[in-house]
């Protein structure tokens, strides 16, 4: 087994990652495979925080004519559903897991309290952050960057459908070029599809590296933590 590059990580999953080929809802086989990969990190002594998107349940911008604020709050509820699903999968494997939400839902989750989240991580518990930042107009990418800064994560592990960052869509263009490493400024100036600009800027300001990799094989989560070069790293360079 290789040496762990990171002590504390923030795993960012899209909601679609939980949906699998269905594209909608939650595929519990996939949730379980992700949970098994996260358990491996915990067993290696790595502290894991996670943020899950909500696009498998609700895509706010697809709500044509709907008030943006209302749509965003619906998205926050969707992320909380996903957080509970992932918590259930992890706990079925014996991994102590806490869900903390930015909007209070005391019957099902803890409210987000930074000091409590840090304490959970130090005790080896996985902490899943739900409901985004609790504010409309901010994406779950931004929530992941914000929580990563707050819990002092060493890196954001950004799980995607593609195996890194390309200069154009590799699904549409055969000549798409993959980057092994990029700076935050290059991502922002070239408008590359990593995180949205708010999240990228937050990572840049707080010097949090972003490691982009494909989740087609959940084992990749462990591989990137052990330093295998299978994705794209975004950092100060």
Curated annotation (Swiss-Prot):
Subcellular location: Cytoplasm
Subunit and interaction comment: Homohexamer.
Top-level division of the source organism's lineage: Bacteria
UniProt-recorded name of the protein: Uridylate kinase
A Pfam family assignment: AA_kinase
Family: Belongs to the UMP kinase family.
Region feature (Involved in allosteric activation by GTP): 20-25
UniProt enzyme class: transferase
Described purpose of this protein according to its UniProt entry: Catalyzes the reversible phosphorylation of UMP to UDP.
Activity control mechanisms: Allosterically activated by GTP. Inhibited by UTP.
Binding site for UMP: 54, 72, 133-140
Biological pathway: Pyrimidine metabolism; CTP biosynthesis via de novo pathway; UDP from UMP (UMPK route): step 1/1
EC number: 2.7.4.22
Reaction catalysis annotation: UMP + ATP = UDP + ADP
GO molecular function ontology, one term from the record: ATP binding
SUPFAM superfamilies, alphabetized: Carbamate kinase-like
Amino acids binding ATP: 12-15, 55, 59, 166, 169
GO biological process: 'de novo' CTP biosynthetic process; UDP biosynthetic process
First-listed, main subcellular location of the protein, grouped into a coarse class: cytoplasm
GO cellular component: cytoplasm
Keywords: Allosteric enzyme, ATP-binding, Cytoplasm, Kinase, Nucleotide-binding, Pyrimidine biosynthesis, Transferase
């Amino acid at each position: 087994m290789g040496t762990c590059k990171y002590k504390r990580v923030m795993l960012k999953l899209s909601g679609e990652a939980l949906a699998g080929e269905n594209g909608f809802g939650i595929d519990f086989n996939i949730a379980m495979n992700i949970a098994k990969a996260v358990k491996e990190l915990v067993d290696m002594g790595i502290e894991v925080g996670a943020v899950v998107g909500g696009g498998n349940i609700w895509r706010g911008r697809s709500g044509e004519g709907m008030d943006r604020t209302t749509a965003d709050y619906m998205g926050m509820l969707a992320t909380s559903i996903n957080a509970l699903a992932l918590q259930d999968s992890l706990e079925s494997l014996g991994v102590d897991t806490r869900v903390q939400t930015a909007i209070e839902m005391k019957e099902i989750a803890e409210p987000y309290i930074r000091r409590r989240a840090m304490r959970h991580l130090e005790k080896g518990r996985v902490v899943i952050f739900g409901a985004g930042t609790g504010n409309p107009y901010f994406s779950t990418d931004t929530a992941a960057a914000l929580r990563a800064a707050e819990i002092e994560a060493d890196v954001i592990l950004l799980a995607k459908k593609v195996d890194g960052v390309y200069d154009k869509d590799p699904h549409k263009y055969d000549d798409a070029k993959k980057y092994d490493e990029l700076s935050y400024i290059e991502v922002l100036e070239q408008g590359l599809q990593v995180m949205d600009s708010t999240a990228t800027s937050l990572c840049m300001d707080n010097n949090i590296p972003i490691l982009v990799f494909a989740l087609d094989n959940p084992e990749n989560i462990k591989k990137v933590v052990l330093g295998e070069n299978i994705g794209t790293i975004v950092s100060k360079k």
